[in-house]
Amino acid sequence: MPESPPLPKRSPLMTSSTTRPASDYPPGGDAFRHRHLTGIAQLTPWEISYILDAAEEWVELNRSGAAKHDDRLAGLTIINAFFENSTRTLLSFEIAGKRLGADVVNMHAAQSSVKKGETLIDTAMTLNAMRADAIVIRHASSGAVQLIADKVDCPVLNAGDGRHEHPTQALLDALTIRRRLGRVEGLAIAICGDVLHSRVARSNILALTLLGNEVRVVAPATLTPPAMERMHVRCFTDMDEGLKGADVVMMLRLQNERMDGAHLPSAREYHALYGLTPQRLEKAKPDAIVMHPGPMNRGVEIDSSVADDHARSTITEQVEMGVAVRMACLDILTRRQRGVPGWN
């Protein structure tokens, strides 16, 4: 995808919890120029804010029940092509599409011809021939989503590809932070755990640094990606040091399916050094929030008493924000093909 031209300057950047309507932006191409959403890396701070502001509206419409009567995507077909197992993300995209009135078709890895030896390019050509109006893809290989996006005629949304990116997770996390803390800039945010294998961590680092936060990576050396300084983060191997003064503590699960035993000796030792306990959380600010993208390994990276502390834990709120963010993304990316005025 060619690099988007710079957007016109706006001041200030819209990141506070009090948002203007998403309609109060320059029309169409001046607001959001992308055909696909393959990663946070393609977005500007202003474009991230644009999506978050649109999602804010969907949060309130979902809570009031009004979103169930929305039909702006009526007549459109969305294919959720998940080549990796998923519960939260798949259900979230399915609910998002249906609340917007679209016909939603879920394709699971076990049902796909990939299991029979079909190449990813052939799968992309097959999906394109079915004339879907949008395709949501999760795949175990980094870059698979971009490969498919290059072969199809409709918008493609990345629901997670290998270790690469998970953009809607980062967007929903940013929205959760903004609603809880009133802003999503100028904060100290500690991302803790298996950062090496985490596409969630990568997308969050990209988004949160772009929005002007101090991002810290807290992990064993064996689970810290190389050259992290290029991503403008501070790295800590000591959990207590990494949590000092943090506004946000984001925990990540150990992705055992993507690692071998060489990365850490045991789950018990990992919990002793990197598990988030009430005592360890005291190192962060008194009003710090605790996040986790799920699924959680209780008693490994996070204690149940911390995960279930609703005053500080945002875990269920993140799930709610996920539906709103994905509704916003589906709406925005299909505006051109729906002929929305200003989105030519």
Curated annotation (Swiss-Prot):
Q: What's the EC number here? A: 2.1.3.2
Group of enzyme by EC: transferase
Keyword Transferase in annotation: yes
Q: Name one GO cellular component term.
A: cytosol
Keywords from UniProt, A to Z, are: Pyrimidine biosynthesis, Transferase
Its annotated pathway?
A: Pyrimidine metabolism; UMP biosynthesis via de novo pathway; (S)-dihydroorotate from bicarbonate: step 2/3
Residue ranges for the region (Disordered) are 1-30
- Locate the residues binding L-aspartate: 116, 199, 253
Is rRNA-binding set as a keyword in this record?
no
Q: Which Gene3D superfamilies match?
A: Aspartate/ornithine carbamoyltransferase
Q: What does the entry list as the binding residues for carbamoyl phosphate?
A: 88-89, 138, 166, 169, 294-295
Can you cite a GO biological process for this protein? 'de novo' UMP biosynthetic process
Q: Which GO terms describe its molecular function?
A: amino acid binding; aspartate carbamoyltransferase activity
Could you tell me what reaction this enzyme catalyses?
carbamoyl phosphate + L-aspartate = N-carbamoyl-L-aspartate + phosphate + H(+)
Q: Which InterPro entries match?
A: Asp/Orn_carbamoyltranf_P-bd (IPR006132), Asp/Orn_carbamoylTrfase (IPR006130), Asp/Orn_carbamoylTrfase_sf (IPR036901), Asp_carbamoyltransf (IPR002082), Asp_carbamoyltransf_Asp/Orn-bd (IPR006131)
Task: Name the HAMAP family on file.
Answer: Asp_carb_tr (MF_00001)
Return the PANTHER family for the record.
Answer: ASPARTATE CARBAMOYLTRANSFERASE, ORNITHINE CARBAMOYLTRANSFERASE, MITOCHONDRIAL
In UniProt terms, what function does this protein have? Catalyzes the condensation of carbamoyl phosphate and aspartate to form carbamoyl aspartate and inorganic phosphate, the committed step in the de novo pyrimidine nucleotide biosynthesis pathway.
Of which family is this protein a member? Belongs to the aspartate/ornithine carbamoyltransferase superfamily. ATCase family.
Q: State whether it acts alone or in a complex, and with which partners, per the record.
A: Heterododecamer (2C3:3R2) of six catalytic PyrB chains organized as two trimers (C3), and six regulatory PyrI chains organized as three dimers (R2).
Listed name of the protein: Aspartate carbamoyltransferase catalytic subunit
Q: Which organism is it from?
A: Sphingopyxis alaskensis (strain DSM 13593 / LMG 18877 / RB2256) (Sphingomonas alaskensis)
